[in-house]
């Protein structure tokens, strides 16, 4: 009833026209019941199956790996195929196996995942690893034998193998005391056995033997060819000079010593400095001597002036008589010792005395006689005049 009410169906004649709606609802309900009764894995596969047709154009059809992936996807999504599906782990193993297939040829093809094998990935990896280790050991043995055989065939010319470095003393000691004792074990084997080993491993060491290491021949005087070790290789440098200390090699661009022009420049500079010092001392002594001479001459001249003019102020009362005139007394006593005053004596005449009236008014003393008029009036002249004249 609730379905008919929901759909708006009324009771009556129109009921026959809506019968197909009821049938569709019933079919939908049955589909839900069937889906719930089935397992969830199968239902999920039915509902979530991707469309492979749309992704085919993205896959490179000429690549075998892409074709194999597409085939595995088809097998995984096939609901009819009830066999064991190829899991992602097996696909990862397939990738690892094919990557290692280029380096190892001893792994049989029965381990391929194309036949749905039951081998685990760990077992396959272990097998591949073991095969690679065996192959590397065989390559090392064959390569060491080739190098040592070439060294033994060289005879007197010593060779230095760049692949091996042997450290230790350079005497005739045992070969087994070296760092690599296993290398010389191959030399004790016979040549026939070594050649058979090479013939057995030609399929695995073809690429490695074609690219052999180059052997450089060097004339090294430090190698000793002993009886126990005919192929002794020495990497130590010999001691040159028979015990004498060798002089280190000189660097081409080494300028540790002084050049000739530098020595000349330093010498000239020292000579100029010494000459400047000597010149300074000589000039200083000359200036000191000239200063002393000038000072002494000046002092001597001052002393002479003082001695010559000392009598000008030396007036004694006994030298002037009481009954004589002052002009006469001064005229007799005032004179210089070196006779520096020899000036013409002015003559005072009557005309010269009567020219001005001021002189007559100021001079009221007794006029001297005509015989005494040639005297110099010393009383009216300062003492400085005599110093200047002297």
UniProtKB/Swiss-Prot annotation:
Spans within the Cytoplasmic topological domain: 284-390
Extracellular side: 38-262
Any one Gene Ontology cellular component term annotated for this protein: basolateral plasma membrane
Keywords: Cell adhesion, Cell junction, Cell membrane, Membrane, Signal, Transmembrane, Transmembrane helix
Transmembrane regions listed in the UniProt entry: 263-283
Targeting signals as annotated region, ranges: 283-390
Biological processes per GO annotation: cell adhesion
Signal peptide limits: 1-37
Cross-referenced InterPro entries: AJAP1, AJAP1_PANP_C
Disordered as annotated region, ranges: 218-253
Protein role: May play a role in cell adhesion and cell migration.
Name recorded for this polypeptide: Adherens junction-associated protein 1
